[in-house]
């Protein structure tokens, strides 16, 4: 404890300040924009031929303009798919007008007419363009310029083909719900029957009488869409239905093996603690179990699955032994190898070199907040570190894995981008040798010096349960240990998340602005956050919010004992799950937190979607106390300090309902509060053209300065 106190009491490090950070610098002027870097594997890259898009017109003679997106056809280099007039839908989905461009004769063909479509793709053989329009999966045959409908029963809020329903898109993190087979003979797709899913409606304040937006959103305990997987035979125009146990289940992924006739359907029960991979025949839909994993809490779903080109093995990551590691299994079940081990977690697979039988991956090592690059062979017996030390390394490899572009930064230093060569010596040992540096962010570093950016330090704080929590601290400019400063906790805290990271940007420009104003800014990763093993992350199972806020309270109490902290001026702010935490801080944490800002907060998990919520809490019927005991709505009578709640009225993710129900509880408890709402804004509450982003951050900043400021802060 004494060593920890001495570490915390170290003076703040910062550059001499000549300029003052303003909100305009952060949110309008782009003063701290990162240096542009041109990094590639080739020494000289011929510039792409310039195309005058203004000479192309649509069917009505209107200029199409510069495309929003250009999709190349790998099978035929002369073909490109253009997306124009793109509109966002939800977090991962958007719709556009589509055009097929042929660079050989500069011809332009509109695909799908004047109706906007989603998820356009070329087939692997370059014969077709697939897309989703009006909830139906469509195919455009390029040689004959004809369109065929794979499905015809699509209908808004009833049937979806080839695209996800809202909750799958948000929580299973994909939107395009179809996959081409490797050779392009088949296309597997999802069919969602969401007719039994309850609707949620949002008022859009867009005309004299407003409008009503309704969509299917299953809240905790509600019924889900009925999901079916079909495999369409492109050549014969026939389809087979994938066979699996139906009922209250999820299909979080489908993936093809290298065999054009073998689809893998990922099956999961509603509790999400059983995952099965079902090997499914393309022609008949018959299936058999390829892999099964069970967990006493829940199984994490991700895209870390590779079906190798040899047709015999697959690679994947799993927490089955307490930490996320890599495994190599045989498709016939005869081989089961754990390739990586230890108490440091694999965070990303950067590439699989099947020729040399090596896997390149990133680990949270040597500390949970660091990232380093490693390589391991398929036997798991030879492992080499390609980067070392504390900091954050991110890598992109070339096709043959002979080189990679390395992006390195740490919490106080902008990124350096370099080209690294993978070297294999005579004893087959592997290391990386730097070939060249593309950029070291000189302009940003100079700007940081001019504005006197402070240096954040990592801290470790004990909680009352015997764990030690990781955090970072940014002290005020010109820190004086004889003075008392207010503290602002910046927290997200949700399952598997991480804010205490040794990368540039973890401490934001806004944090630096607050430090210049005289605030101590702190972030602490509580119990339930990621990269410290399964048990630390899953301790919060069935009781979201309980241990998390107890950790934040412990950290605030600890800091409040330090002689340079104004214990009566400790605040907490967060967004989304972080807003849930801030609302708990001002209620259950009323003894230590004197102010809180909650932006777009969940205020009761009864109001949130079922896939996310039930993964950690099961259903409200099964776990009523878990839902209610830690809902800030049920603790408003404890509030002693100041509370600001902010929400967008068109938040499709965390509904505005959460704010209204919290305010209802505040009124009932006769608690004074402040609120702000942003009409027609979604969960991100953003917008540069209409000034929303600047307005929100200005309001929040001024409120914090006014409520938490003391004699040692600037207003």
Language-model segments: residues:
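Short beta-strand and adjacent tight-turn residues that come in two discontinuous sequence segments
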Residues: 10, 189, 598
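Beta-propeller folds
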Residues: 7, 16-403, 411-413, 709-714
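Serine-hydrolase catalytic core recognition
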Residues: 199, 260, 394-715
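Sec-dependent N-terminal signal peptides
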Residues: 3-13
């Amino acid at each position: 404890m004494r060593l920890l106190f001495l570490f915390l009491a170290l003076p703040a490090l910062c550059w001499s300040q000549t300029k003052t950070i303003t909100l305009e610098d952060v949110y309008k002027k782009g003063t701290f924009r990162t240096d542009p870097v041109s990094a590639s594997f080739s020494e000289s890259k011929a510039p792409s031929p310039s195309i005058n898009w203004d000479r192309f017109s649509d069917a009505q003679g209107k200029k199409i303009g510069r495309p929003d997106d250009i999709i190349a056809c790998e099978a035929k280099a002369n073909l490109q798919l253009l997306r124009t007039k793109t509109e966002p839908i939800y977090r991962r989905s958007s719709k556009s007008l589509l055009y097929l461009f042929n660079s050989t004769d500069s011809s332009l063909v509109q695909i799908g007419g004047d109706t906007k479509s989603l998820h356009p793709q070329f087939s692997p053989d370059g014969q077709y363009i697939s897309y989703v329009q009006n909830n139906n999966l469509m195919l455009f045959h390029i040689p004959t310029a004809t369109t065929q409908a794979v499905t015809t029963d699509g209908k808004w809020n009833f049937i979806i083909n080839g695209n996800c329903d809202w909750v799958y898109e948000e929580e299973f993190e994909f939107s395009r719900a179809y996959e081409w087979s490797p050779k392009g003979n088949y296309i597997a797709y999802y069919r969602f029957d969401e007719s039994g899913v309850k609707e949620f409606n949002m008022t859009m304040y867009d005309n004299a009488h407003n409008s009503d937006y309704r969509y299917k959103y299953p809240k905790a305990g509600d019924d889900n869409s009925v999901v079916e997987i079909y495999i369409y035979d492109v050549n014969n125009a026939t389809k087979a239905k994938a066979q699996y146990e139906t009922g209250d289940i999820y299909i979080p992924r489908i993936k093809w093996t290298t065999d054009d006739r073998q689809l893998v359907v990922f099956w999961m029960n509603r509790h999400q603690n059983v995952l099965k991979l079902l090997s499914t025949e393309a022609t008949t839909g018959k299936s058999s179990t390829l892999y099964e994993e069970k967990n006493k809490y829940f199984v994490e779903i991700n895209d870390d699955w590779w079906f190798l080109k040899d047709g015999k093995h697959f690679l994947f990551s799993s927490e089955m032994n307490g930490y996320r590691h890599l495994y190599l299994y045989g498709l016939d079940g005869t081989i089961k190898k754990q390739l990586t081990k230890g108490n440091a977690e694999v965070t990303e697979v950067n590439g699989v070199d099947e020729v040399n039988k090596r896997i390149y991956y990133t680990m949270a090592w040597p500390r949970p907040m660091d990232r380093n690059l490693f390589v391991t062979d398929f036997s798991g017996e030879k492992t080499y570190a390609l980067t070392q030390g504390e900091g954050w390394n991110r890598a992109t490899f070339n096709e043959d894995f002979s080189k990679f572009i390395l992006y390195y930064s740490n919490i106080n230093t902008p990124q350096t981008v370099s080209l690294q060569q993978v070297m294999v010596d005579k004893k087959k040992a592997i290391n990386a040798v730097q070939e060249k540096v593309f950029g070291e962010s000189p302009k940003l570093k100079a700007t940081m010096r001019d504005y006197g950016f402070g240096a954040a330090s990592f801290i470790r704080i004990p909680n009352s349960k015997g764990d030690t929590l990781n955090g970072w601290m940014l002290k005020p400019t010109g820190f004086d240990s004889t003075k008392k400063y207010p503290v602002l906790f910046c927290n997200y805290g949700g399952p598997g998340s991480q804010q205490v990271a040794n990368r540039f940007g973890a401490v934001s420009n806004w944090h630096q602005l607050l430090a210049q104003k005289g605030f101590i800014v702190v972030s602490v990763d509580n119990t339930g956050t990621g990269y410290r093993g399964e048990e630390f992350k899953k301790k919060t199972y069935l009781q979201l919010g309980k241990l998390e806020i107890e950790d934040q309270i412990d950290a605030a109490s600890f800091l409040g004992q330090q002689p340079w902290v104004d214990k009566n001026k400790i605040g907490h702010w967060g967004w989304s799950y972080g807003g849930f935490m801030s609302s708990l801080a001002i209620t259950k944490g009323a003894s230590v937190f004197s102010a809180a800002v909650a932006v777009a907060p969940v205020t009761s998990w009864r109001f949130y979607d079922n896939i996310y919520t039930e993964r950690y809490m099961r259903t409200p019927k099964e776990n009523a106390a878990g839902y209610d005991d830690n809902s800030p709505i049920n603790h408003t009578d404890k509030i002693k300090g100041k509370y600001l709640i902010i929400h967008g009225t068109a938040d499709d993710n965390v509904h505005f309902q959460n704010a209204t129900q919290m305010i209802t509880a505040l009124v009932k408890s006769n608690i004074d509060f402040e609120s702000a709402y942003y009409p027609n804004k979604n969960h991100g509450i953003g917008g540069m053209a209409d000034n929303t982003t600047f307005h929100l951050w200005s309001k929040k900043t001024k409120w914090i300065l006014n409520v938490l400021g003391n004699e040692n802060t600037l207003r």
